[in-house]
Amino acid sequence: MPPPLQAHRLLISHRRLPSPARRRFTAASSLQSAPATTLAPGPATSSILSIRESLLSGERTAADITSEYLSRLRRTEPSLRSFIHVADAAAEREAEELDRRIASGEKDAVGPLAGVLVGVKDNLCTANMPSTGGSRILDGYRPAYDATAVRRLQEAGAIVVGKTNLDEFGMGSTTEGSAFQVTTNPWDDSRVPGGSSGGSASAVSARQCVVSLGSDTGGSVRQPASFCGVVGLKPTYGRVSRFGLMAYASSLDVVGCFGSSVFDTATILSVVAGHDKMDSTSSSQVVPDYASELVSLDLLESKPLAGLRIGIIQETLGEGVANGVISSIKGAASHLEQLGSVVEEVSLPSFSLGLPAYYILASSEASSNLSRYDGIRYGRQFSADDLNELYGESRANGLGHEVKMRILMGTYALSAGYYDAYYKRAQQVRTLVKESFKDALERYDILISPAAPSAAYKIGEKINDPLAMYAGDILTVNVNLAGLPALVVPCGFVEGGPAGLPVGLQLIGSPFCEGNLLRVGHIFEQTLQNLSFVPPLLAES
């Protein structure tokens, strides 16, 4: 039973310290809507909740539900290419076993995620299917264990339907960097889904699965969520175990999740979050039941966000951000004001320094982490006459261009002659970024910004211009540097494609305050009466 509204308000801390670097936000913009589709718009509904209710009532079987999703996956996968590996036969067997247990009256059969089909980004280990990291060097690799996040989903009753595509080892923003295939965007198959978790975002957007897992090192959950019109959550660093996640940059990597609604995303977080003895960086803080704290639309008052203070980051609405994106974000801010919150502009002076610092730090950590891929212990091995040649051949043939480039960049930054000039200075910038966010979040309950400078762009548009691609991460990397939680919810559209292109609103909170973000995101989502984030691909099929 959701808590009453007053309890909901009390769950959000309100700090009102004076700030010289703020001004009242004003916006006349309305939320940007997309051209009409054949599916009726309305508040996002929970697929997880409806699946659970239908199983408990006997209205549907797990086999029926699985068949529905697999049918849609088979229909759309040739054009989307969201999955590197599909475990359809295994999913059908698990669904049949669940039905058998329900029929036999086993009380624990219908777990919180019973019958829910989940896609898993292919840099998370799965013992019963290949785990490649999107790289040729791990082609055919089958781990001996499941990642903790995957195991917890399965223990809650979820059915893993397959491994989703990604930029190789998470290094990219378009999913064009995969060694196996290019994933497309369900809103327009000539456009990228974002990255590096593009396969996970595309799969949820196209309803190939109910929810999915991704990873976020510098925006790899949030930017694809914005591009594909789904909800994406990057938890606080340490909130979810990284055990079984192929390491890219260990001080930045976070396991995140995607859903078609905030409720679904909150439900997944409640399952996967929590301390894990296999990950020394995982937090021992108590994990709330995030979904139970969400208030349904019919229980909301006219001003459900009254008393909430929101800061809109000035630096995210300037040069380099598309006008249509700015209009959508301003429209979303105006909507939040109509719900009762106070929205003011706030400046984060160190914001622009985050991007170069991030790429130095991430590449430096990657140069160490990826040294484990040597062609000996696991993965693909290339023939050679001696050990050094084996290392060279395996890495030269097994790793892609972007990965090699970042390894070289990181090795350079860590070298004796340049450590102080690059790596040490980047760490100092990271401290400034953390302090900047800390100061802002002492004055505001939540900060907001766009999740990406533009909507989804054409496949091939930026793949040969790495600087332009890196610049696209400027709105997300600071959150990783600071280790903060952030939620992306669809908030509007810009022109493009057959039915417009979605834009995501990024909500940023204090450490371990995911509950605040989810409550505000849920209220925002539920009150968008005239927007539907169902891609035309589904309306046609």
Swiss-Prot record:
The keyword Acetylation does not apply. Allows the formation of correctly charged Gln-tRNA(Gln) through the transamidation of misacylated Glu-tRNA(Gln) in chloroplasts and mitochondria. The reaction takes place in the presence of glutamine and ATP through an activated gamma-phospho-Glu-tRNA(Gln). This is Glutamyl-tRNA(Gln) amidotransferase subunit A, chloroplastic/mitochondrial. GO terms for biological process: glutaminyl-tRNAGln biosynthesis via transamidation; mitochondrial translation. The active site is at K121, S196, S220. It comes from Sorghum bicolor. SUPFAM superfamilies: Amidase signature (AS) enzymes. The lineage of its organism: Eukaryota, Viridiplantae, Streptophyta, Embryophyta, Tracheophyta. This protein may be expected to contain an N-terminal transit peptide but none has been predicted.
